Every structure is written in C-alpha cells, then in structure tokens.
Design a protein with these regions (language model features):
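N-terminal amphipathic/basic leader segments beginning at the initiator methionine
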Residues: 1-27
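Mg2+-dependent prenyl diphosphate-binding active-site environment of isoprenoid biosynthetic enzymes
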Residues: 7, 20, 32-277, 283-296
Length: 300
C-alpha cells in the first residue's frame, strides 16, 4: 500500500485542482458575472491548504465497492466546498472570532466581514453546482440521494444546527450527552456523510451503508475529541489557528468536562470501534483504518 501520508497529499492536490478550476474567472452558463473581490475571497478560503480529509473519505469508501473514482472526487469536492464555507463563517467575530486559519489570515481579516459572509454563502452553492452538473454521470436516484444527504448533513439537523448548539453552550452548559450531540452535529455530520457517500455512489446494500455511517460517526467524534485535546496541548504555530480558544471562550467540550487523559483513552476506544466496523471489508479497508489512526494521532 502506498504510504498513507503520500496518498492523503495526492488526494489533497487533486481536490484542490478541481476547486481551483471551479473557482476560475470563467463565466459558466446561467451566470452573469463573477465579481473579482468575491472570487478572490472564495479562493482564499478554499485554496488555503488543508488535509482534504472529507473528500479522501468519500473516495476511499467508494473504493471498497470499486465505484467510479471520478464521480467520488466530484462528490468530495462538493463536500470540501461546504466544509470550507463553514470554516469561513466559524471564524467570524460573531462566532469564534479567529484571526488565523491554516497559518494565514482568516477571510474576514484578509478582506472584510461582509465579503467573508458572502464568500461562504457562494461556496455553499458551489457544492450543489458540483453535484448537479450534467458532466457528472450518475443515475438520477443516486444523484438525488447524494444531494439530499449533503443538504441534511450540512443544515438544520447537522452542521449548522451543531454550530448553534455550540454557541448556546457558552452560556448554558450541556451535560456529556449534550456535548456529544453537539459534536456529532457540528463536526461529525459531514464526516459521516463522507463515509456514506461512497456507499451511495456504489449503490451498496443498506447493511454496508449503515456500517459505514457508524464508522463515520465514530471517527467524526474522534476528530472533534482530538481537536479539543490539541486546543489544550498544542500551540498556535503547530495548529495553524489560535490555540487555547476553547478554554478562553469557556466552551463546553468533553476535554473540559473530563480532562486530557480521559479523552486520550476515549480516542483509543473510538479507534477500536472504527476498526471493528471495517472488519467485513477485509484488506480493502486498510486505508480507512489508517485514516482513523491518522485522525487520533494528528498534530493539527
């Protein structure tokens, strides 16, 4: 198997190229103009590095079923556009109020707040441009399932709803169950969708789709838990964003509730859960197992 780090980097380049092409100055059918400042802000927010982990999960779950990888990349690019829009909005003064993202000024710092809001809005629509493009050759029912799943994972009952719960938690502290729900929505929903999408693309069985959904839920919680540990134990240079923000904002996290050592123990448990869920897929799931390990051992 090709070195995991190289695989992840290769995928990041490919997804970056797809997003770069979509965010060119070329006016597409149905558009009137592409304002240069808005386009520059979108490019700043989406082409500023990143691991592209969510697209990687779409592609690698699709490989389990020998699905069309070009289609999986397209779905992955759509998902990454939504993820990047969420980061732009998350960094705004009204929310996390952060100056750095991936070691560079956040979009509202590089441009202004209004432009950052609109850049995020436009990236959200780009996602559905990817999925509805007739160049993406998909069965209509599969396409609709992908669009519907992404909309629900990103919206009221998923990522956006989780962000609201996160803001509310600054003043009204949730218990452990409430924090897990918050994190499953804010962070986990898009990761779970990434793992489901590969199965949807392949028209996999309900059992396989549900198994991958559970895998996505486990690594989604692990991702957020690892993030919360890093916020406490790492520094701004290593993270590429301001360290210690959760403590300063008095945010409700499992690390704040139980401590770092408890969190590290939980991460190992989630890793085992993720591995167990992949057993039926045999050696074809080795890269997904490596991805789960990467999530809990990453440094940023």
């Amino acid at each position: 198997m090709e070195d995991f780090t190289n695989l992840l980097a290769k995928n990041a380049r490919q997804i970056g190229e797809m997003l770069d092409a979509k965010l060119s100055s070329h006016i597409e059918a149905g558009e009137i103009a592409r304002p240069s400042r808005l386009l520059a802000a979108m490019r700043h927010g989406v082409l500023n590095g990143g691991k592209r982990l969510r697209p990687f999960l779409v592609i690698e779950t699709a490989r389990l079923f020998d699905a069309n990888i070009e289609a999986a990349q397209c779905v992955g690019a759509a998902l990454e556009a939504i993820h990047c829009y969420s980061l732009i909005h998350d960094d705004l003064p009204a929310m996390d109020n952060d100056d750095l993202r991936r070691g560079k000024p956040t979009v509202h710092k590089a441009f202004d707040e209004a432009t950052a809001i609109l850049a995020g809005d436009a990236l959200l629509t780009i996602a559905f441009d990817f999925l509805s493009d007739d160049k993406l050759e998909l069965d209509a029912k599969i396409r609709l399932k992908l669009i519907n799943g992404l909309a629900r994972s990103a919206g009221l009952g998923g990522m956006v709803g989780g962000q609201v719960l996160d803001l509310e938690a600054e003043t009204k502290k949730p218990d452990e169950s409430g924090i897990i729900t918050l994190e499953a929505m804010k962070t986990g929903a898009l990761i779970r969708y990434a793992c489901e999408a590969g199965a949807i693309l392949s028209n996999a069985t309900r059992e396989d789709r549900e198994r991958l959904s559970e895998f996505g839920a486990a690594i989604g919680l692990a991702f957020q838990l690892a993030d919360d540990v890093l916020d406490v134990t790492s520094d701004t240079k290593a993270l590429g964003k301001t360290a210690g923000k959760d403590i300063a904002a008095n945010k409700a996290t499992l690390v704040a509730l139980h401590g770092v050592e408890w969190a590290k123990h939980q991460l190992e448990g989630l890793m085992k859960q993720a591995d167990d869920l992949l057993v039926p897929f045999g050696n074809k799931a080795d890269i997904l197992k490596a991805t789960a390990r990467f999530i809990i051992e990453r440094k940023n």
